Amino acid sequence: MAAAKEKSDVLVNNEIHNCAELICSICRQLYKSGWVTGTGGGITIRTGDHIVIAPSGVQKEKLEVKDMFVMSLTTRDYLHTPKQNSKPSQCTPLFLSVYTSRDAYACIHTHSQEAVLLSNLFAQKTHFESSGFDVQRYIPRGSKKNGFYKFEDTIRIPFINNTAHESDLQSNLQKAINENPYTCAVIVRNHGIYAWGDSWEDAKMNTEAVEYLFHVFLRDYRIKHSKNCRFF
């Protein structure tokens, strides 16, 4: 990925600027939900051939438009880099895999506790499976083009193993995407999730729906396995 060249600031473009503002807003919401903490997690939104990416090493609840990186999806050149010493997101190679493999228009990477706990609970499983929840009606079969799940369907979200460096996850993520055409999310063990969508709205909703399933499942599991719980 080449460094940004001297050219007019693409952030003045209305669509790109709007994407940058949305990223700041969504990151604050993710922070309040406890799905990103400190500088962890990441998000990107695409408009045409331009992809706007939150930086690495910046607290997500304090992001501003000027902090964003902008890249050309076609050339992989950076069209805008922040003036301060910000680093491109370590998630960028994974975001690019999602964009090119699924023709997505946004991708969110959380560091939620629920995803981490779930990956430990199902340490021997290849997928998290869910069935019978009404929220499943809002989750697409990989893409809205394929329709949506019904509450009686079984949703299967693949697990992939974590790596020492975020960028090294790309091959694991790509394999999971290729082998699971009807998923819109992947769980990274002891790390978090990547969820995407046909628009930023879809990516946000898919993230929220998947995290909801994790939360409900874990609460149900705790109740059923707690020695202090009694049912009458």
Curated annotation (Swiss-Prot):
For binding substrate, which residues are annotated in this chain's numbering?
A: C91
SMART domains registered for this protein in UniProt: Aldolase_II
Matching SUPFAM superfamilies? AraD/HMP-PK domain-like
- Membrane-spanning residues: none
A GO MF label = methylthioribulose 1-phosphate dehydratase activity
What this protein catalyses is: 5-(methylsulfanyl)-D-ribulose 1-phosphate = 5-methylsulfanyl-2,3-dioxopentyl phosphate + H2O
Q: What class of enzyme is it?
A: lyase
Q: Where in the cell is it found?
A: Cytoplasm
What pathway does the annotation place this protein in?
A: Amino-acid biosynthesis; L-methionine biosynthesis via salvage pathway; L-methionine from S-methyl-5-thio-alpha-D-ribose 1-phosphate: step 2/6
Q: Which domain of life is it from?
A: Eukaryota
The biological process GO terms on file are: L-methionine salvage from methylthioadenosine
Q: Which UniProt keywords apply?
A: Amino-acid biosynthesis, Cytoplasm, Lyase, Metal-binding, Methionine biosynthesis, Zinc
Which residues does the record give as Zn(2+) binding sites? H109, H111, H191
The record's similarity note reads: Belongs to the aldolase class II family. MtnB subfamily.
This protein is called Methylthioribulose-1-phosphate dehydratase
Tell me which species this is from: Schizosaccharomyces japonicus (strain yFS275 / FY16936)
